[in-house]
A protein has these predicted regions:
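Conserved N-terminal phosphate-binding loop of PLP-dependent enzymes in the Aspartate aminotransferase
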Residues: 9-12, 34-489
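N-terminal mitochondrial targeting presequence
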Residues: 1-38
Length: 489
């Protein structure tokens, strides 16, 4: 059984001390000619146990990582400090669609880093404007507003929608609403978690913004519930949004939605839902905002996930994650001029947004998606992936695996712990997958998101499928799960 984080912390000082002593002794014994070696070669690299213990002792505990340490990666593969190889089936939450350390993107980064990294938007720089032209042309919008993180992009879209509502729709000042759906995830800032229905995002963090989210408590009542079922606006249920807009559409600035819910467990709405959303938003003069941060840029087999429905073109889209290929934080908000120009100079911005380094990286990241046909790759690989895992579920209806869902290479499997003869959980299955050479992580306890880099090869995908199939059987027979110290909660 792997030692707990607490036990690892107690071992850390002695291990580091031994490493330092060995390094010092080696340096003293080395010939004089070796003193010109790179400094990095003289440093003793921490092993995985030391890294985990050190992070546990010195970093905030706002994540509960799988007990694996990543040291380097290439394409769909990553390695730990001990040299163990893994197939990455999380892709940093779909940030490395182009694969780890794609050579073209790394080259763009290093070349630009020797020229100019940051100018701020106080001045023009030579890399941002060509990037802006490229992304707006590619996705069919007039303008882009650059930011750094996905949450920043969403916050920017919310501000933009409210400003539009006051300037163009003439909603009374202070009254503009933003509607969302139940189980949404758009980030973790106060503004964004104000819209959340996830207790872990809200408890202990209030008070929250008013007039945002899927709940209409200020106008709903037991006698006249809005929506009609008396709860939050449900994802994929167009009647809920229709009822809400009938009641508050006149003061609603925007409806914000994920084309596929990611953190909720890769929830795909009924086909036609987004087209119906668009129609309702147009009817009530409400902006349709699509959060494509996790789903966009080829992940689902289309450049934008909303494009799986013909004719769907949101008023505003947000992008992030794979916009830089996982190399540098870059995000963006896209809209047409009528909306984008509602924000005037000085009203919104970011020191790093639109910086030349980020623009160079993002521009190359987009080119890689197009040149390597990653949309087609995601579509082909995803269909095969789901078909093979669905066959496992169909062949064993009483087994742990109860559902396979997704689009492209954004997929999830649903695990029913109550069907496990040994009471095994999705977390324990992920520990076993890790021990067998594949990395994935549960969301909402019983769902495992499976989203490898889009550059994964046929052989690697075959290996990933085999590992998952075998682990689903082995988890029910093995007496002890490797690395399971019972610390996860």
């Amino acid at each position: 059984m792997a030692p707990s984080a607490t036990g690892l912390v107690s071992q850390l000082s002695s291990k580091l001390s031994v490493s330092s002593s060995k390094a010092a002794a080696a340096a003293a014994a080395a010939p004089a000619s070796s003193t010109s070696s790179k400094t990095a070669n003289n440093k003793q690299q921490l092993d995985s146990e030391q890294v985990i213990a050190l992070e546990h002792a010195t970093s905030a505990h706002n994540y509960a990582p799988l007990p694996v340490v990543l040291d380097h990666g290439q394409g769909a593969l990553v390695w730990d400090p001990e040299g163990n190889e893994y197939i990455d089936c999380l892709s940093a939450y779909s940030a490395v669609n182009q694969g780890h350390c794609h050579p073209r993107i790394i080259k763009a980064l290093t070349e630009q880093a020797t020229k100019l990294t940051l100018s701020s938007r106080a001045f023009y720089n030579s890399r941002y404007a060509p990037f802006a032209e490229k992304i707006t042309t590619l996705l069919g919008y007039d303008m882009v507003l650059p930011m750094n993180t996905g949450a920043e992009a969403v916050e920017t879209a919310l501000k933009l929608a409210r400003k539009w509502a006051y300037m163009k729709k003439r909603v009374p000042e202070g009254m503009a609403r933003i509607l969302t759906v139940e189980n949404n995830f758009h980030g973790r800032t106060i503004g964004i978690v104000s819209m959340s229905t996830d207790p872990s995002s809200r408890v202990g963090f209030g008070p929250f913004l008013e007039r945002v989210g899927p709940v209409l408590d200020d106008v709903s009542s037991p006698e006249n519930p809005i929506p009609a079922h008396g709860g939050p606006i449900r994802y994929g249920v167009i009647e809920d949004l229709e009822h809400a807009l009938q009641e508050v559409g006149h003061e609603t600035a925007a409806f914000l939605v994920e084309p596929i819910q990611g953190e909720a467990g890769i929830v795909v709405p009924p086909h036609g839902y987004l087209a119906q959303v668009q129609e309702l938003c147009k009817k009530h003069n409400v902006l349709f905002i699509c959060d494509e941060i996790q789903t966009g840029l080829a992940r689902t087999g289309k450049m934008l996930a909303c494009s799986h429905e013909e004719g769907v073109r949101p008023d505003i889209i947000t992008l992030g994650k794979a916009l830089s290929g996982g190399v540098y934080p870059v995000s963006a908000v896209l809209a047409d001029k009528e909306i984008m120009l509602c924000i005037a100079p000085g009203e919104h911005g970011s020191t790093y947004g639109g910086n030349p380094l980020g623009a160079a990286v993002a521009s190359e990241a987009l080119d890689v998606i197009l040149d390597e046909d990653l949309c087609g790759q995601a579509d082909r690989m995803g269909k095969r992936f789901r078909a093979e895992l669905q066959a496992v579920a169909d062949a064993n209806p009483d087994g742990l695996l109860t559902e396979v869902r997704g689009k492209g290479l954004l997929n999830a499997i649903v695990i029913d712990q109550s069907k496990s003869k040994k009471g095994r959980s999705a977390w324990q299955l992920c520990l076993l997958l890790k021990a067998r050479g594949l990395l994935a992580k549960p969301t909402h306890e019983n769902i495992i998101r499976l989203a490898p880099p889009l550059v994964i090869t046929d052989d690697q995908l075959t290996r990933a499928i085999d590992i998952i199939k075998n682990a689903l059987l082995e988890v029910e027979t093995i007496d002890e799960i490797p690395g399971d110290d019972g610390a996860h909660h």
